[in-house]
Each structure stands twice: as structure tokens, then as C-alpha cells.
Curated annotation (Swiss-Prot):
It holds the Pfam family TSP_1. It comes from Plasmodium falciparum. Residues 112-116 are annotated as: Region I. Sequence repeats lie at residues 123-126, 127-130, 131-134, 135-138, 139-142, 143-146, 147-150, 151-154, 155-158, 159-162, 163-166, 167-170, 171-174, 175-178, 179-182, 183-186, 187-190, 191-194, 195-198, 199-202, 203-206, 207-210, 211-214, 215-218, 219-222, 223-226, 227-230, 231-234, 235-238, 239-242, 243-246, 247-250, 251-254, 255-258, 259-262, 263-266, 267-270, 271-274, 275-278, 279-282, 283-286. Transmembrane segments: none annotated. Residues 289-304 have a biased composition (Polar residues). The gene is CSP. Residues 390-412 form a propeptide. This is Circumsporozoite protein. Essential sporozoite protein. In the mosquito vector, required for sporozoite development in the oocyst, migration through the vector hemolymph and entry into the vector salivary glands. In the vertebrate host, required for sporozoite migration through the host dermis and infection of host hepatocytes. Binds to highly sulfated heparan sulfate proteoglycans (HSPGs) on the surface of host hepatocytes.
Length: 412
């Protein structure tokens, strides 16, 4: 049944696609034919118009040239008339006719001016002279006189007046004004300003100066003084204080601290050291001799039962109860176990079920050799809790995944 449905669907899809392609080909062919017809008609019309315009344009230009030639030469002297008579009756091509017309155009033209009515006209007279003009005009008059000039001009006017003077000048202006006055003076300046003011005053002076300021201020004051200085500073402060003192010093520091403290103290000391540590501990104890030297029992370096007991203790630590914290012995054994692989990253949890520890090297001790690491000051420890047994959980997860894959392969 499934095979029949698949064959039917594929056949239907191919049939519909074939119909669509046939329809598409027919439509594009029809559109192409109509487009070609339109292009042919447009091309023919444009070609006809272009040829017609070129033909009539050339004819019109040629006849216009002949007409202009006849118009220019119809009143010339007898040579031109003879040239026209000699050209009449000759059957020559258009090129010769055009050459003769061009020769006529190159001949000089005579000025034909309108003659005045009297018997002795001036051949150079201006034909546009006003017939009502004044016959007593000054021959030296300015030819560029303003025709709109004032006919009632002041005859006593200053001949040396400034031609660029302000026509809107104040008629009531002070005739005795200072000729050297500042032309860029402030028009809004204070008319009651102090005439004895300092001409060299600071232009950038503070406009908000305290009017009650001390007129006898210290002229040697520090110009770089702190503008945000404490106004309530201690007047009895030490004038010889250390200028390089720590600005972030603890304000609650012990004022009775030991002045003879060790200046070379360890800068990488453990900040989380036990505040209740034994103050009477042995200062000469060797922290690295716990399992070395000539110890007794299983601490002897060549004890054959030592590794057996350590492995047994490690197995017992792995089986630690969920409600118990990791013991010091468990921590020490785990540190020895991962001594060569410890780094600044947190190590895996020491147990797979229950409570364990994670350790790492403190960032300040990262450059120390691993043989010189101090477990108290250079190693950081924290407790980790494993709620599920990771080994059993991993086995169950792997089994379920394998079963699902096999079922999917064989059932299909």
C-alpha cells in the first residue's frame, strides 16, 4: 500500500511539473512574438522619420543658402550681376553651384546707410541722434552722466567728497568725534565705566570672584593647590608627613603597632591563616620531614607495608559516608596522590560518592616549585559533595544510550 501511494504521489508531481513547463514555454513564446512585432514597427517608423528629416533638412539648408546668396548679391555692382548672368543657363552639378555661392559670400559688403535730408550729409553721422538734442551741448561733457541725476544739485558741494560715503549717515553726528576711535567698539558698553580702570586687566579673570576675599592674600601661595582640599583639616597635623604614604591605608589600623616589626615579612603569606593557631608551637619544626628520616613503623622510607596501608586508607576515604566531613588524614593522602598534577585550577573531587575535597595552588604561589609548596600557605582547599555516585550513573547512562541505538537500528 505504501509503495502505491509513493508511486502515485511521484507521478502526480511529475505530471503537474510537465504541464507547468508547457504553459510557461507557450506564454514566453507568445510574449516574444508580440515584442518582436513591436520592435519591428518602432524600428521602421524611426528609420523612416530619420531618413525623411535628413532629406528635407539637407534640401532646406541648400535652398536657404541659395536664397541668402541672391539676397546679398542682388544690389551689388556689375561684376556680381555679370557673375549671376554667366551662371544662368549652365547645367552644372550642385557642387559647382555651392562653390559659386561661397565665392559671393566671401566678397566684401558695402555699408548702405540711411542718408539725411540735407544736401551735405555727414558720412560718419550717428543715425540714432536725437533730433531734439541741445545744439549747445558741452563737447567735453561726461558721456557717462547719470540720466537720473538731481537737476537741483548743490552748486557749493564739496568736489572732493567721498564717493563711497554712507548715504544713511546720522545728520546729528558729532562733528568733533575722535577720528582714531575704535570702529569695533562695543555698542552696549557701560557708559558709566571707571575711566581709571586698569587697561591691562586680565580678560580671563573670574567673573564670580568673592567680593569679601582677603585683599592681603599670600602672593607666594601654591598655584597648584588642591581645589577640593579638606576645609576641616587638622591645624596641628605633622608638617613633615611622608609625601609617599599609602593613600589607601587602613583608617582603622592599630595606632599602637610595633614600630620594630619585620619589614621583610612574607608578602605571599596566607590571608586565611588560623587566628586561633597555637602561639607556643615549635618554631624549629620541619614541616617537610613528616614521612622522611628514620621514622618508626610505617613511616620508615623502606617499609614494605607502607604502600599497602596507604592504598587501603585511600579506598576507605573513597567510601566515605555522605554525612561525614573529610578528615585531615584523607586530605593529606589526596594531596600526596595528586602532588605532581596539582595546578592553579581546582582539582577533581577526591571522592565519587559523599563528601570530599578539591585543592589548587594559590595564584600568588603559582611560580614556586612543587617540591617547595607549603600545604598550609600555598595550597587552597574546599569541600565538595557528590550527591550521586558518578561511576554508577555513567554506566547506567551508557547502557540506556546503547539500548536506544540498537532498538532504532533493528526495529526499522
Amino acid at each position: 500500500m505504501m509503495r502505491k501511494l509513493a508511486i502515485l504521489s511521484v507521478s502526480s508531481f511529475l505530471f503537474v511539473e510537465a504541464l507547468f513547463q508547457e504553459y510557461q514555454c507557450y506564454g514566453s513564446s507568445s510574449n516574444t512574438r508580440v515584442l518582436n512585432e513591436l520592435n519591428y514597427d518602432n524600428a521602421g517608423t524611426n528609420l523612416y522619420n530619420e531618413l525623411e528629416m535628413n532629406y528635407y533638412g539637407k534640401q532646406e539648408n541648400w535652398y536657404s543658402l541659395k536664397k541668402n546668396s541672391r539676397s546679398l548679391g542682388e544690389n551689388d555692382d556689375g561684376n556680381n550681376n555679370n557673375g549671376d548672368n554667366g551662371r544662368e543657363g549652365k547645367d552644372e552639378d550642385k557642387r559647382d553651384g555651392n562653390n559659386e555661392d561661397n565665392e559671393k559670400l566671401r566678397k566684401p559688403k558695402h555699408k548702405k546707410l540711411k542718408q539725411p535730408g540735407d544736401g551735405n550729409p555727414d558720412p560718419n553721422a550717428n543715425p540714432n541722434v536725437d533730433p531734439n538734442a541741445n545744439p549747445n551741448v558741452d563737447p567735453n561733457a561726461n558721456p557717462n552722466v547719470d540720466p537720473n541725476a538731481n537737476p537741483n544739485a548743490n552748486p557749493n558741494a564739496n568736489p572732493n567728497a567721498n564717493p563711497n560715503a554712507n548715504p544713511n549717515a546720522n545728520p546729528n553726528a558729532n562733528p568733533n568725534a575722535n577720528p582714531n576711535a575704535n570702529p569695533n567698539a562695543n555698542p552696549n558698553a557701560n557708559p558709566n565705566a571707571n575711566p581709571n580702570a586698569n587697561p591691562n586687566a586680565n580678560p580671563n579673570a573670574n567673573p564670580n570672584v568673592d567680593p569679601n576675599a582677603n585683599p592681603n592674600a599670600n602672593p607666594n601661595a601654591n598655584p597648584n593647590a588642591n581645589p577640593n582640599a579638606n576645609p576641616n583639616a587638622n591645624p596641628n597635623a605633622n608638617p613633615n608627613a611622608n609625601p609617599n604614604a599609602n593613600p589607601n591605608a587602613n583608617p582603622n589600623a592599630n595606632p599602637n603597632a610595633n614600630p620594630n616589626a619585620n619589614p621583610n615579612a612574607n608578602p605571599n603569606a596566607n590571608p586565611n591563616a588560623n587566628p586561633n593557631a597555637n602561639p607556643n608551637a615549635n618554631p624549629n619544626a620541619n614541616p617537610n620531614k613528616n614521612n622522611q628520616g628514620n621514622g618508626q613503623g610505617h613511616n620508615m622510607p623502606n617499609d614494605p607495608n607502607r604502600n599497602v596501608d596507604e592504598n587501603a586508607n585511600a579506598n576507605n576515604a573513597v567510601k566515605n559516608n555522605n554525612n561525614e566531613e573529610p578528615s585531615d588524614k584523607h586530605i593529606e593522602q589526596y594531596l600526596k596522590k595528586i602532588k605532581n598534577s596539582i595546578s592553579t585550577e581546582w582539582s577533581p573531587c577526591s571522592v565519587t560518592c559523599g563528601n570530599g575535597i578539591q585543592v589548587r595552588i594559590k595564584p600568588g604561589s603559582a611560580n614556586k616549585p612543587k617540591d617547595e609548596l607549603d600545604y598550609e600557605n600555598d595550597i587552597e582547599k574546599k569541600i565538595c559533595k557528590m550527591e550521586k555516585c558518578s561511576s554508577v550513573f555513567n554506566v547506567v547512562n551508557s547502557s540506556i544510550g546503547l539500548i536506544m541505538v540498537l532498538s532504532f537500528l533493528f526495529l526499522n
